[in-house]
A protein has these predicted regions:
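Histidine-centered nuclease catalytic patch
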Residues: 1-14, 26-45
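Helix-loop elements that line ligand-binding/catalytic pockets
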Residues: 31-106
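Cys/His-coordinated zinc-binding microdomains
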Residues: 17-20
Length: 169
C-alpha cells in the first residue's frame, strides 16, 4: 500500500462493494484509466441489454477497457465469480427500464414520468436508464436532474454525452 496516498482525499472515490473488492489493492497508474469524477465515463462505456458492458469504439478505448477490467464490469454469468451479481442487477434494471418505457408510451403523462424517476432514484443504474430513454429528451433531463452529482457539463443541449472538461473523454 502506498502510505502517501492511503489517506489522501485526492485518492478517494466512492464505489460499490463489488467494484472496490474487485480492484482490491491493485497498484495502478490512475492516468491509464477513466474515472467518473474526472471523465465522462458514460461517453466511453456502453450499457446494453442483458446487463452487458462494453467499450464505445473510438472514445478513449484503451482507458475505458482498463477500468472495466480493473473493477470487473465485464463479468458475465459465465464468469466463475458467482458472488458478483452486478451483471444480473444490470440486466434486471435494463428489463425494468424497458417495461417503464413501454408503459410510458401507453400512458404518457407527467405522473408516469415522475413515477419512473422515483423508481430510478430508488433502484439506481442511471446509465442504463439514460441508455434506454436515449430518444426522450424530457426523460433524459429528468434523469440528470434526479441524481445529485450528475455533471450536466458532460452533456450537450440534446443530452448527448460530450467530453468532460479536463478529462480524457
Amino acid at each position: 500500500m502506498n502510505e502517501e496516498r492511503a489517506l489522501s482525499w485526492n485518492n478517494f472515490l466512492l464505489a460499490c462493494t463489488n467494484c472496490n473488492s474487485t480492484k482490491g489493492n491493485t497498484d495502478i497508474n490512475i492516468y491509464d484509466y477513466l474515472w467518473p469524477d474526472r471523465d465522462n465515463t458514460f461517453r466511453a462505456i456502453r450499457y446494453a441489454e442483458g446487463g452487458l458492458v462494453s467499450v464505445v469504439p473510438g472514445v478513449a478505448e484503451i482507458h475505458a477497457k482498463k477500468i472495466i477490467e480493473l473493477i470487473g464490469l465485464d463479468r458475465t454469468p459465465d464468469t466463475p465469480e458467482a458472488s458478483d451479481r452486478r451483471w444480473l442487477n444490470r440486466r434486471e434494471a435494463w428489463e425494468m427500464a424497458i417495461r417503464a418505457k413501454d408503459r410510458l408510451m401507453c400512458c404518457n403523462v407527467d405522473a408516469m414520468r415522475e413515477q419512473i424517476i422515483e423508481l430510478v432514484v430508488a433502484k439506481g443504474f442511471w446509465s442504463i436508464w439514460m441508455t434506454v430513454f436515449k430518444d426522450d429528451i424530457d426523460m433524459l433531463q429528468r434523469l440528470m436532474d434526479a441524481l445529485p452529482g450528475t455533471s450536466k457539463t458532460c452533456f450537450d443541449a440534446t443530452h448527448q454525452p460530450i467530453a468532460r472538461s479536463g478529462g480524457q473523454c
